Design a protein with these regions (language model features):
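Short, Lys/Arg- and Gly-enriched loop/turn segments at beta-strand edges
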Residues: 159-166
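Divalent metal-binding pocket/active-site signature
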Residues: 1-21
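His/Asp/Glu-enriched, well-ordered alpha-helical/loop segment
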Residues: 21-36, 40, 52-156
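Active-site environment of divalent metal-dependent phosphoester hydrolases
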Residues: 11-16, 41-45, 69-70
Length: 176
C-alpha cells in the first residue's frame, strides 16, 4: 500500500463515514506518513489536532508548501505559469481564487502549529525534523542530532523565532 500522503486534505475529497477516501486509506495503512501544511491557511487548527490524534505523532510530517514568493511583499507572482496574488500569508490564483501554495516557511509553520494550533512542541519538532527524514529514508543521516549524522541544526528562541542556523556543522546565520 501507499506509504505517504501528500498535502493531506488539500484538493482531495473529504473524509466521510461512507467514503473515507485518501484520508481513511492513509489511516488504515499503518506505515503511511501524512503531510500537513500548518501555515494557518490550508487546514483548520482543530483538523490539525485531530490528525495528530488520529495518526499519532510518529506519522505526521509538517510541510510548508512554500512557493518562491515566500518572504516577498504582497503582490502578484507566478507559479507554474499561472498568476498568483499574495496578500499577507495567503497565496491565491488570480483566476479562480483557489489556494496556490503557501508563503510561509517551515519554521513558521512549526511555530503556528505550536502557538496557534496547540500542537505540543515535541510533536511539532518531530513532525518537522525526524518524521520527514524517516519518510524519505534519510533518517540515518538527517532528522536528529546524533554522532555521525550531518550537522544541520536550527536554533529557536523561547518564542520559536529563529536564533541560528548551522549547516554541515558551520554557523551560516546567527541573530542576536
Amino acid at each position: 500500500g501507499a506509504n505517504h500522503a501528500t498535502h493531506l486534505y488539500n484538493a482531495m475529497p473529504p473524509f466521510s463515514h461512507r467514503a473515507p477516501g485518501v484520508i481513511g486509506a492513509a489511516h488504515d495503512s499503518a506505515h503511511c506518513m501524512v503531510e500537513l501544511i500548518t501555515d494557518g491557511v490550508h487546514i483548520h487548527p482543530s483538523v490539525v489536532r485531530t490528525t495528530f490524534d488520529m495518526f499519532g505523532d510518529d506519522r505526521v510530517v509538517l510541510i510548508s508548501d512554500s512557493m518562491r514568493a515566500t518572504g516577498m511583499p504582497d503582490g502578484e507572482y507566478t507559479l507554474g505559469g499561472q498568476a498568483v496574488q499574495v496578500r499577507g500569508n495567503r497565496a491565491t490564483l488570480v483566476e479562480g481564487g483557489a489556494l496556490a501554495g503557501s508563503v510561509t516557511n517551515l519554521a513558521d509553520c512549526m511555530r503556528v502549529a505550536v502557538k496557534e494550533m496547540q500542537i505540543p512542541l515535541e510533536s511539532a519538532v518531530a513532525a518537522a525534523t525526524m518524521n520527514p527524514a524517516k519518510s524519505v529514508g534519510l533518517y540515518d543521516k538527517y532528522g536528529s542530532i546524533t554522532e555521525g549524522k550531518v550537522g544541520n541544526v536550527v536554533l529557536l528562541r523561547e518564542d520559536l523565532s529563529l536564533k541560528a542556523v548551522i549547516q554541515n556543522g558551520r554557523v551560516v546565520r546567527w541573530e542576536e
